Amino acid sequence: MRSSKTAVLKVDPRRPDAAAIACGARVIREGGLVGFPTETVYGLAAHRSDRKAIDRLYAVKKRSRGKPLTVHISDMTMIRSAGCRMTGSGKILAKNFWPGPLTILLKSAGGRKIGFRMPANTVALRLIAASKVPVVAPSANLSGKRPPTSAAAVLKGLGGKIDLVLDGGRTAVGIESTVIDVSVSPAVILREGAIKARVLAKFIDIA
């Protein structure tokens, strides 16, 4: 899918149409870029193992190559498939805050840190599961611009540059996820977002 026009499919955020989800998953598998709703902001999904798709994702967003991409998952087994293992503190956070607006950084077998997030949004979870490939998804906007909370906002910034947008209405939270590194002890918050540091500190030690 490489047209100059971005397709839009409306989906019920609670009961998304299976055909729309399948269409989005197919676009991702084929190397396309798909805007989709999460509970925080709209994400821009790409096949993590497709080099051309990742190159295009960085180019479309005008994103610095030094900024890593978060892996979005629909179940915990996807963490191990990505070459990582949950730490003890990570398990505690996942149990209490996933699905939800929390990105957890883990260290891979090769020593590289990878962020994981399980969004609390039915459209997102079904799209990730149906893709059957590892999915990365930064916010669906030009870098430095306000993250979009609606399909219209995605199209305003990236219309004609991406392949598909699944329009699931306005996002519920509207604030980006909190990012925490649990590969170190005590854990370190890299970005405070929808979940406040003081809330996380009730569950694990934070620097």
Task: Give the residues covered by each predicted segment.
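Active-site-adjacent structural elements in enzyme catalytic cores
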Residues: 1-207
